[in-house]
Amino acid sequence: MSTSGPNPPGQPQVKSLNCPGCGAALTLRSFAQAVTIVCDHCHSILDAQDPRLTILQKFKAATNEDPPLIPLGTRGAIRGTAYEVIGFQRRTIHVEGISYSWHEYVLFNPYKGFRYLTEYNGHWNDTAILRSLPIVNDAVSPPTVSYLGETYRHFQTAAAGTSFVLGEFPWQVRVGESCDVSDYVSPPRVISSERSGKEITWSMGEYVPGRDIWKAFALAGDPPLRVGVYENQPSPLRADTKAIWLAFAGIVVVLTCPQFPFR
């Protein structure tokens, strides 16, 4: 995890729009890269690729029913790069009759594109889409995937459904949509595949202590307490745990740099 300084400063533009469903003002931060945007007043999911902002779906929810721990519009730095939180969704899986919900945050940088933060019961992961495919080995039990010389063991597979959304997304998000998610772990990292129809997306997450997320985004108060042990949470006895904490400590330095690219 790099602790180098941020990218050269830039002045991101913000586009103002109005919801065709209720007329409320909308703010578009990722421009042409946004595929859908959600009105937080009438809960219409809109086609951001259509100049008319065609309504794709409406869902019933209270805006404050599941408020993001990191508010939309918050800016921070991860791996030496500044990002803005532009989207938020709640997803749920059902395992042996029990529902488990977690939160995902869409982050955007106009030069670097998108990355994601996930949170479940106080456990956080910094996640990015893989640009090359891992090697899957289904001939062993449990199955494994290999990526950049590291082997990840299958943890679980379940159908994950989206139940709440806010902000903008680089895909056509829908409340009620579902896909099959498989997790393969090698703490502190996890590789996940999401299968929807014939499309498969692979991503890699790295476990991050909540306190480092709070420092990175200059959030008030304390992060939620961790409950239980997460699938890719590193053991405190492992040497690489210290390396993770030291790497993320560099974020604090980045935030104090006068050349912070978001102003």
Predicted features by range, described:
Residues 106-108:
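Short, acidic/hydrophobic/Gly-rich beta-strand patch recurrent on exposed beta strands
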